[in-house]
């Protein structure tokens, strides 16, 4: 299902952002410019330990949002306090690369984030020290692909943006140029 046109954000990155970043950090080589590698969307369904049907709703939601079938995350070991057995499905995740990644990022930044109630921006402190950024969304209905009448329950998700940046300053600059609405510290 490859699109014939280049995604809007990818074009903007290639034509404008890459040049700005190269000037800003004065790179000697074009390949040193930070870029996006992949986006991982993770949906943990802890209640699936008690009711295995709940994982189907998470898979359906993730497929609708990302356009890609998610991989089911299984428990690595048994934990009696959580009534969890090894190998039991406890979540689902999708790894997006290429054009699908750019399209998803564009939809998230321009459509989903503005639909969050009382949204004041993303925290600028959630970088991992290597230029990758992770943020959480509390409900899946902020994506317009999800029909609000058909959801069985509200589920949150974690979205990790993996970049080629070597430190947080480069990663923050890349994501700010791409249009991430960071809160001012």
UniProtKB/Swiss-Prot annotation:
GO terms for cellular component: ribonucleoprotein complex; ribosome. One of its GO terms (molecular function) is tRNA binding. Keywords: Ribonucleoprotein, Ribosomal protein, RNA-binding, rRNA-binding, tRNA-binding. InterPro entries: Ribosomal_uL5, Ribosomal_uL5_bac-type, Ribosomal_uL5_C, Ribosomal_uL5_CS, Ribosomal_uL5_dom_sf, Ribosomal_uL5_N. It comes from the Bacteria. One of its GO terms (biological process) is translation. The keyword rRNA-binding applies. Belongs to the universal ribosomal protein uL5 family. This is one of the proteins that bind and probably mediate the attachment of the 5S RNA into the large ribosomal subunit, where it forms part of the central protuberance. In the 70S ribosome it contacts protein S13 of the 30S subunit (bridge B1b), connecting the 2 subunits; this bridge is implicated in subunit movement. Contacts the P site tRNA; the 5S rRNA and some of its associated proteins might help stabilize positioning of ribosome-bound tRNAs. Part of the 50S ribosomal subunit; part of the 5S rRNA/L5/L18/L25 subcomplex. Contacts the 5S rRNA and the P site tRNA. Forms a bridge to the 30S subunit in the 70S ribosome. HAMAP family: Ribosomal_uL5_B (MF_01333_B). This is Large ribosomal subunit protein uL5. It comes from Streptomyces avermitilis (strain ATCC 31267 / DSM 46492 / JCM 5070 / NBRC 14893 / NCIMB 12804 / NRRL 8165 / MA-4680). The lineage of its organism: Bacteria, Bacillati, Actinomycetota, Actinomycetes, Kitasatosporales. The gene is rplE.
